[in-house]
Amino acid sequence: MDKPLNMALVGASGVVGQKILQLLQKKDIKIDNLFPLGKSTVGQTISFQNKDYIIGDLDSFDPKEANITIFSAGGSVAKKHAKKFVESGSYVIDLSSEFRYEDDIPLIIPEINGDILENLKEPTLIANPNCSTSQLLMVLKPIHERYGIEFLNIATYQAVSGTGKEAVEELRSQTYDNDSIESKVYPKPIAFNVIPQCDIFLDNAFTKEEMKLVWETKKILDPKIDVQATCARVPVFNGHSEAVFLKISNKASREDIIEAVQGTEGVSVMDNPDSLEYPTPYEQANDSEDVYVGRIRSQDIQGLSLIHI
């Protein structure tokens, strides 16, 4: 008889925490006991599977109550608490960047390297890649397997939902009241603008978000791939977009790439120039978990270009 699924969700009231609960409910995954946890939100009520839950205090919660725990409350919270949950017998999935680059902690995209999970013998801390990396590698894995990717140049156009509730509200308020714009979340106004900065700048003049794409692509897909990235924040509520140029080892046509990507779990191809069929955040990002890819083009230099949402 399977063990009951007792899940703790740290950051349950946030944008990501709420999305996790929506996905669990949509996929009809039965949670026997849910423990929503937080710090500043203790005492608030959330709803899940037709039941109301009171958010509990993370600091006083007994980790032994949970056999799986999801952290969606940022790196500092995960750093303080995640390993204590593992030591108490819980499998832990951390959505922050806190543990992604530690050699002994698996960085998992289930559709790509989920087989690693099958070999786990005991409760483990599992890192979740950056959202931009996950959608990128979902598309690139079948291409790399068939044709070998040597070089990537990525430009991201990232929605404000990736920053959190405050960013969503900032875009909404600036859009409605453009005369008195006040920026608290971002360094520049986000409404009617494009901000060529996601996360902090590092010593090499790249932002941390850009380097996440580099580090995580190499760790998950192939350390030999040369990766260049530019990340921008755009005035879109939901749905990150990425324009990708890749150089491959073996020449492939546009049709070859479409064939390679089609049928990949979690990926949908939308690419018909004649009927103006291509993905957009507005149409595809709100009601689906799939990655949508289009505008696929092949170049004579064994290069490919595409856009995905």
Please provide the spans of the model-predicted regions:
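Oxyanion-binding "anion nests"
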Residues: 194-237
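Conserved small/polar residues in nucleotide/adenosyl-binding loops
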Residues: 307-309
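Noncatalytic modules at the cell exterior or secretory-pathway interfaces
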Residues: 303-305
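Short amphipathic alpha-helices in soluble, non-transmembrane regions
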Residues: 256-264
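N-terminal Rossmann-like NAD(P) cofactor-binding subdomain of oxidoreductases
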Residues: 2-190, 226, 259, 271-301
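Glycine-rich beta-alpha junction loops
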Residues: 40-42, 131-132, 156-163, 194-201, ...
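Conserved glycine-rich beta-strand-loop-beta hairpin in the small C-terminal domain of fold type I
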Residues: 238-243
